[in-house]
């Protein structure tokens, strides 16, 4: 079936998108395309062919049938209008409804209904202008829908996909191979139920609001392009965001059976390299999932829920020497993860371990100065001198928070870095605060996860390098770094 879908989309693209002559006679050009398709075994018919004074061509009652009726495309009308301003540019429109029929000898007949309101597709380089400095492509539609038209389809049990306020633009600069694009959607609705012979059953009913995508890249596979991003010679970025989303889905395959429903308040992914700086941000807002079935490779879990407030990854750094130390940041945060009792009960039915939310947060910043020679990066990385890669002036712990099973670990502190010794050496202090760890260790012993002897050794080691805190089950340790060595509350640590 995938082959036939590809054939259908290819046929549509070829019928109005393949240049055969460098000329702006769109009427003659379209005749040549139809003739070429006919010579390859396709059957093309239409009730009327209207050629306008503006050079436009409208095919009314359009029907394109591939050899052996494998793919049939039917539309009330298809129209192309050449630009009066940009040579070779053509704008295409389609009747509000069209039907694509795929006759697959293996999976049967699949009927796909395509509906649209205000669909407009504009492409450069159609009848001429293929060598223009910049080629552009755009798609606009108030709405665009794809549904199944065969209630007895053995594969597509249900299909209803809808795009609202679609806007997409792409430009390609031929000399530099610069590819720039932007896509926007007010909403995306997806309802499908697919019974695939090899993959299994895939079903989902969901929607997402306010989808945005933008990118700028050099469209080649030359490894030097990456060096251009890092050196600041070229700007590249990928930015994606989505608003509130919800879905109910099933995945039934030979390896897994998963059924769930979930919601999310939003997602952001951004990667940018510009002017000698690199920044990566990934963030997922409040998310909740409920799994009614979860079985992978014959290992089932009971129905369970999982939720979290935030997942965030943030990394930013200069990549070239701008003449002074500059701030770099690294953050990984998973906040307030809550898992339902049904999962805990699998290994701790007696509730020996506290059911507190899980947090894992590390947020660091540093002042750094990169020294990599991006014209010959191997020389910098293989010199054996860390200073040829870069220098670190200081490091600050903005936040460390780890919680699980009633225990909590926090840390704060900072250190300055001496780069004169042939390797970076820190001088400073980090204060660790550990609370609830005795209760967690006792719980792990109670459920048999760790032996009592090992638990005692671990607690004894911690007490040797920590002092009692304000609470009954709380310990504090000051880790100090100096040229004389590393100590914990004044006790030298083995090096």
Say what each PLM segment does.
Residues 1-22:
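Gram-negative bacterial Sec-dependent N-terminal signal peptides
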């Amino acid at each position: 079936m995938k082959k036939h879908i590809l054939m259908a989309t290819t046929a549509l693209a070829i019928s109005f998108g393949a240049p055969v002559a460098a000329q702006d006679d769109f009427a003659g050009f379209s005749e040549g395309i139809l003739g070429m398709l006919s010579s390859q075994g396709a059957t093309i018919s239409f009730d009327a062919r209207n050629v306008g004074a503006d050079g436009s061509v409208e095919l009314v009652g359009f029907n394109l049938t591939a050899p052996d009726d494998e793919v049939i495309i039917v539309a009330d009308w298809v129209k192309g209008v050449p630009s009066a301003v940009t040579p070779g540019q053509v704008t295409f429109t389609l009747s509000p409804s069209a039907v694509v029929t795929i006759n697959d000898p293996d999976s049967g007949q699949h009927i796909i209904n395509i509906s649209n309101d205000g669909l407009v597709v504009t492409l450069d380089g159609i009848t001429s202008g293929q060598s223009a400095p910049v080629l552009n492509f755009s798609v606009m539609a108030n709405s665009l829908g794809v549904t199944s038209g065969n209630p007895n389809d053995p594969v597509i049990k249900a299909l209803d996909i809808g795009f609202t306020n679609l806007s997409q633009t792409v430009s390609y600069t031929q000399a530099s191979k610069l590819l720039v694009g932007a896509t926007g959607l007010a909403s995306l609705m997806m309802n499908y139920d697919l019974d695939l012979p090899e993959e299994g059953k895939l079903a989902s009913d969901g929607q997402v609001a306010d989808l945005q995508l933008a990118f700028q890249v050099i469209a080649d596979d030359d490894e030097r392009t990456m060096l251009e991003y890092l050196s600041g010679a070229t700007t590249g970025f990928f930015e994606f965001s989505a608003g509130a989303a919800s879905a109910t889905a099933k995945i039934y395959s030979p390896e897994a059976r998963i059924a769930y429903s979930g919601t999310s308040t939003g997602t952001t992914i951004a990667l940018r390299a510009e002017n000698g700086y690199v920044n990566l941000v990934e963030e997922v807002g409040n998310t909740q999932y409920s799994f009614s079935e979860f079985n992978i490779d014959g290992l089932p879990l009971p129905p369970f829920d999982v939720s979290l407030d935030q997942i965030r990854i943030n990394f930013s750094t200069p990549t070239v020497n701008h003449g002074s130390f500059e701030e770099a940041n690294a953050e990984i945060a998973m906040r307030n993860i809550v898992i339902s009792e049904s999962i805990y009960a699998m290994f701790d039915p007696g509730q020996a371990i506290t059911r507190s939310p899980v947090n894992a947060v590390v947020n660091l910043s540093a002042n750094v100065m990169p020294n990599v020679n991006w014209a010959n990066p191997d020389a910098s990385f293989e010199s054996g001198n860390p200073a040829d890669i870069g220098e670190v002036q200081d490091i600050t712990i903005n936040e460390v928070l780890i919680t699980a099973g009633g225990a909590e670990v926090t840390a704060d502190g900072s250190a300055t870095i001496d780069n004169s010794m042939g390797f970076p050496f820190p001088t400073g202090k980090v204060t660790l605060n550990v609370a609830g760890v005795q209760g967690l260790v006792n719980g792990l012993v109670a459920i048999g996860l760790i032996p009592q002897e090992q638990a005692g050794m671990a607690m004894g080691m911690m007490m040797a390098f920590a002092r009692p805190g304000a609470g009954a089950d709380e310990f504090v340790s000051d880790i100090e770094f100096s040229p004389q060595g590393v100590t914990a509350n004044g006790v030298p640590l083995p090096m």
